[in-house]
């Protein structure tokens, strides 16, 4: 007799026609190239959860597989659930169990916070103990409420597809910590004389119950933050391989997070958040002429804490996944990100997270450096995306927008590219691609190589002249 797992794989797996790692992609970012190619897309928790068109389409495909299946397997699956005939609602239950089996496979390679890593055998045992009246209700009227109730019974968690990795895993819990969650405030008390009160004594008396905070902890936080942002490599000691407690719980008030928590948070913010992507230069023929260069051209302001670009203007860049950070300023949904200048403190702030650590980066840059006494010239191209989670676009099925430098050699302006994929973006700086702004399409400017009486050719034109471009591609020098 075949096991339930083998029967589900035999009946449901033919409905998943896609490439490798598509299920992993679905569980993490909720995106597949085409929803009709994966039966698990029916359970994505959005407005189209168990949509009629999608379920009808998969049910028709399933009936073809069901009729081709041998009689013994069909009788076994009906005997396990005590059903006389196959219906659409029965198919949805089988597809949901297959979804749980695939989640077990995903959890074998990922450790997700608060999600129990159950084996398939444990899930089957718990499923057998599920109240029969609730199972009949699910088969009678399948809905998100009924499937969510079954999921909560098995995992003690709400059903969520994709899995909310950006707010549930320990990294993101650390990532979103506020300063007041790091340690408790302390109260400063004074002992003063009862008579002969001076003006200073009056102020001391008014400040008896004013919380001043832990100034030693604040100084240690500043030192660690400066160190982590100044050096590329550092060691953080972990006591007994344990990062808990991450957030101060009401039940565990005696267990206060240590300075280690803040150090891990700082490292994660520096390592994970980014809206800048360095592009590989496949051909140097697009190296710009320095005769038209400007000092402040291609400068971008990046917040080191939240990773967003703050001077992208009013461009609305498409991007799905974003690290949601706690804001200390009022922030409307998806409004223009900018820099706030405080006239009281004479400091600059990020309008999104309130961070004061702002850095400048160039989207295009030609620079020189020395290696063992040899002068080396290098060209750097970068792209700005609309999300601070650049790692989520590393999938060819994810489409996004980006701001890059204009490909014209005499132009130092930017251009907004739409509906890009990671493969298209990585091949952008090549000989065969052109992405010019509107001004460059109407205005012709001469470079050093175009001038007949040019006395000295700039460095950019020299690099462009050395690039070996052919009809079929290009070679780097």
From Swiss-Prot:
GO terms for cellular component: viral tegument
GO BP annotation list: viral process
Transmembrane segments: none
Family per record: Belongs to the herpesviridae UL49 family.
This protein's name: Protein U33
Organism this protein belongs to: Human herpesvirus 7 (strain JI)
Gene (name only): U33
